[in-house]
Amino acid sequence: MATATNAAAAPPRQLSQKEADIQMMLAADVHLGTKNCDFQMERYIFKRRNDGIYIINLGKTWEKLQLAARVIVAIENPQDIIVQSARPYGQRAVLKFAQYTGAHAIAGRHTPGTFTNQLQTSFSEPRLLILTDPRTDHQPIKEAALGNIPTIAFCDTDSPMRYVDIGIPANNKGKHSIGCLFWLLARMVLQMRGTIRPGLKWDVMVDLFFYREPEEAKQQEEEEAPAVDYAITDFNAGAIAADGQWPGTIDQSWSDAVPQPIPAVPGVNWGAPAEAPAAAGGDWGEAVPPPQQIPVPPSGIDTVQPSGWD
């Protein structure tokens, strides 16, 4: 009887952790915690390094990922699930997760009262809330607790577990770690729904869930932009000879479009003999008579008498 119970509780072989998945989690630093440890996170700690960093047990992380995927699949309408991240490193992963699973994504700052104030236009009553960091997303956690909304969150070693129903122990501060976790969770959800066969590889790369710098994204968009083609497309390409020379028919058809050359201006011969002198009156050495005076008519004003002030 106990054997049958254990077999029923064990996950399917296709969904069990594989070496490639564990290596990917290790490469993304999912197992690295912080130097502080919350008392409710001690059960998920594997050991502590010499520099004080706590190491998270990835076996516990995989079990919690499967539990979270089962809860997500149990909800009939995916739009009743809200995936939210106020941390910049998790915003792209949240959008990609919502794209492939059909959930509703909120990337950025949480508007207070979204889950409690019915007068707001953005008011919603989700059936499940998935968060990236309980410390950064403390406001939606408190509002979800007031509305009896179950909460799933990625919890680091120093994350508070208050009002968190399912805490997935993992590194929630690295951009590669957050993207890897959401990629694994999305793949598990699609496998449990039957969208992806468990034995086959998912064709979506994990790199799509990683955070990208704005400058890097802008540079890639500029490189992928289509270049403008200014080439001539209406010429007769078949008329070009094999040696690359234009035949005479094309020269005749384009003869009207070729502008005529400008006639040359005859040059001046400075060595020619001097011409005949100019006509009379053109000698500059001749004396010029003085100009004639023009008489001024009288104005009719008498001569001003002396005033004695001179």
Curated annotation (Swiss-Prot):
GO cellular component: cytosolic small ribosomal subunit
Protein name listed in UniProt: Small ribosomal subunit protein uS2
Pfam families: Ribosomal_S2
CDD domains per the UniProt record, alphabetical: RPS2
Feature: compositional bias, Low complexity: 270-287
Gene3D superfamilies per UniProt: Glucose-6-phosphate isomerase like protein, domain 1
Record's subcellular location: Cytoplasm
Keyword set includes Cytoplasm: yes
Keyword Cytoplasm: yes
Annotated GO biological process: cytoplasmic translation; ribosomal small subunit assembly
Subunit organization: Component of the small ribosomal subunit. Mature ribosomes consist of a small (40S) and a large (60S) subunit. The 40S subunit contains about 33 different proteins and 1 molecule of RNA (18S). The 60S subunit contains about 49 different proteins and 3 molecules of RNA (25S, 5.8S and 5S). Interacts with ribosomal protein S21.
Record keywords: Cytoplasm, Ribonucleoprotein, Ribosomal protein
GO molecular function, a single term: structural constituent of ribosome
Record organism: Glycine max
Domain of life: Eukaryota
UniProt similarity note: Belongs to the universal ribosomal protein uS2 family.
InterPro entries to which the protein is assigned, alphabetical: Ribosomal_uS2, Ribosomal_uS2_CS, Ribosomal_uS2_euk, Ribosomal_uS2_euk/arc, Ribosomal_uS2_flav_dom_sf
Lineage, top ranks: Eukaryota, Viridiplantae, Streptophyta, Embryophyta, Tracheophyta
Region (Disordered): 264-310
